[in-house]
Design a protein with these regions (language model features):
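ABC ATPase nucleotide-binding domains
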Residues: 78, 103-105, 120-122, 127-237
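ABC-type ATPase nucleotide-binding domains, specifically the catalytic core motifs of the NBD
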Residues: 73-74, 97, 104-117, 128-129
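Helix-to-loop junction immediately C-terminal to a conserved catalytic motif
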Residues: 53
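ABC ATPase NBD coupling module
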Residues: 70-85, 115-116, 229-233
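The feature captures the beta-strand-to-loop junction immediately N-terminal to the Walker
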Residues: 38-40
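Non-catalytic connector elements of ABC transporters
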Residues: 245, 252-365
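Conserved ABC transporter NBD signature motif
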Residues: 61-72
Length: 365
């Protein structure tokens, strides 16, 4: 475990009966970073968080939190828990206690803090989450967003080194969820606590993180910065899961440096960047982000093909086109609505171009 890490998972395995939930998971979380663990339901992300806080016990491998290896030693586990805040999707507020009393419960009972000091800290946290005027109200008198702010304040009040957040915004509506994403991000930036944030929402992951760990099938598929993850996915699952993606199935028929030629299942040929499929004869799924393809490109691109517009959908800042291209009837283009004078309508044939460097030859699906 490096000196700048607060969490280290090494070859961690976890089973529920015969179901192998975590499979040789390796993950290092740096001090004061904001890392998002993102993946579909059942991928193992929440189980990993529960193992870190010892709500579940792993069977194999090593988990170290703040220099302490988590084993069956209850003394060690309790000392770690005193430094870890938790926020869940369910707010878990005590309905018979006021907001301030909910927040002071942990410092008074866990850290044996004097009541007056705990109440002062509670008010400081309520200022941070911008609801100090709600201190004497009860949870039932608050909106969902206000209750979640109380849950966040409660997790921070005893100055933890680490906060674990397991889908904390899942119960909120879209607008409130987006607002709270920025609030949590700004709180982290202002106080510098380490945050491990679990979500299945790809947009939330891109918004909230310094780094993203994409989980699937009990494994970390890729751990990267948001831009690296989006622009340079290492396999087909990551490319599909993070952001929108156009795909073609095919076989590599030639390779020269950072360019390969792929014969698609439709019989057409395109040029791509050999990332996973690097040898002649390898099957591949080719990945291309919608915004990387252009209509009637003004510059030379090494892929140029004709497609037919099947559907036009207005999205405010851009128009979304569904195109029949090279055997893919679900090929998506995004055209900025500042592109004036472009004749876009269903049934029209268009020229579409993109560069091979933006088109990644990944593992076959």
């Amino acid at each position: 475990m490096s000196e700048d890490s607060i969490i280290s998972l090494q070859n961690v395995n976890k089973w529920f009966g015969d179901f192998h939930v975590l499979k040789d998971v390796d993950l290092q979380v740096k001090k004061k970073e904001r890392i998002v663990v993102c993946g579909p339901s059942g991928s193992g992300k929440s189980t990993m968080i529960r193992c870190i806080n010892r709500l579940e016990e792993h069977q194999e491998g090593t988990i170290i939190v703040d220099g302490i290896e988590l084993t069956g030693n209850l003394k060690n586990i309790d000392s770690v828990r005193k430094e870890v805040g938790m926020v869940f999707q369910q707010f878990n507020l005590f309905p018979h206690l006021s907001v301030k009393e909910n927040i002071t419960l942990a410092p008074i009972w866990v850290k044996k803090m004097p009541k007056a000091e705990a109440e002062e800290l509670a008010m400081q946290q309520l200022e941070i989450v911008k609801i100090p005027e709600q201190a004497d109200k009860y949870p039932g008198q608050l909106s969902g967003g206000q209750q979640q702010r109380v849950a966040v304040a409660r997790s921070l009040v005893f100055d933890p080194k680490l906060v674990l957040m397991d889908e904390p915004l899942g119960a909120l509506d879209k607008n409130l969820r987006e607002s709270m994403q920025y609030e949590i991000k700004h709180i982290h930036e202002s106080i510098g606590v380490t945050v491990v944030y679990v979500t299945h929402d790809q947009t939330e992951a891109l918004t909230m993180s310094n780094r993203i760990a994409v989980f699937n099938d009990g494994k970390v598929q890729q751990l990267s910065s948001p831009d690296e993850l989006y622009e340079r996915p290492v396999n087909s699952f990551v490319a599909e899961f993070i952001g929108e993606n156009n795909t073609f199935g095919g076989e590599v028929i030639d390779v020269a440096g950072d360019k390969c030629k792929v014969k698609l299942n439709s019989g057409a040929e395109i040029f791509a960047n050999p990332i996973v499929a690097k040898a002649k004869g390898e099957k591949t799924t080719v990945s291309l982000r919608p915004e990387r393809a252009l209509i009637d490109p003004q510059t030379t691109m090494d892929n140029n093909h004709k497609g037919k517009i099947e559907e036009v959908i207005y999205h405010g800042d851009h128009t979304r086109l569904r195109v029949d291209l090279l055997g893919n009837k679900q090929f998506i283009l995004k055209v900025p609505n500042s592109s004036s004078g472009m004749d876009i309508k269903a049934g029209k044939e268009i020229n579409i171009g993109w560069n091979s460097i933006d088109c990644r030859a990944l593992d076959p699906k």
